[in-house]
Amino acid sequence: MHTKAVYPGTFDPITNGHADLIERAANMFAHVIVGIAANPSKKPLFSLQERVDLIKEVTEHLPNVEVIGFEGLLADFADSQGATVLIRGLRAVSDFEYEFQLANMNRRLNPNLESIFLTPAEENSFISSTLVKEVALHRGKVDQFCHPAVQAALKEKLQQ
């Protein structure tokens, strides 16, 4: 079976936690689309195109991973890509309630869509894009939390 999965998120920026989930998903599914949400309700540090470019660089070693920015409903995006699986990461129990509601809403909007929840590797369980940006903002070292390309992009962006 040629199952196509979407791993959606804002990825502002992509962290080692995200990269780990993408790599694991790439081993589970024939084709993984990293769907980068434009999400107008959030004020991202990086533009949509910058986030696409960073994730392409981080995932370039994974031939079955495609990176696409999107606007609108995730359920519609997944349908337009022919995906039947949504991959979501759960860092802590506190993530579950929101993700459970989201999974049910997405299934209601697109009955062919199943949500799969992956937990992070222990060393990545506390990492979030928000925390990585906060550490970088205060000139802390983020090398253990994100890819070198992301480190360089953060440094450049925060010096502006």
From Swiss-Prot:
Pathway: Cofactor biosynthesis; coenzyme A biosynthesis; CoA from (R)-pantothenate: step 4/5. SUPFAM superfamilies: Nucleotidylyl transferase. Keywords: ATP-binding, Coenzyme A biosynthesis, Cytoplasm, Magnesium, Nucleotide-binding, Nucleotidyltransferase, Transferase. Gene3D superfamilies: HUPs. Substrate binds at T10, K42, L74, R88. It comes from the Bacteria. It is found in: Cytoplasm. Disulfide bonds: none annotated. The record marks H18 as: Transition state stabilizer. Coiled coil: none annotated. One of its GO terms (cellular component) is cytoplasm. NCBIfam families: coaD_prev_kdtB (TIGR01510), cyt_tran_rel (TIGR00125). Reversibly transfers an adenylyl group from ATP to 4'-phosphopantetheine, yielding dephospho-CoA (dPCoA) and pyrophosphate. Homohexamer. This is Phosphopantetheine adenylyltransferase. It comes from Pseudoalteromonas atlantica (strain T6c / ATCC BAA-1087).
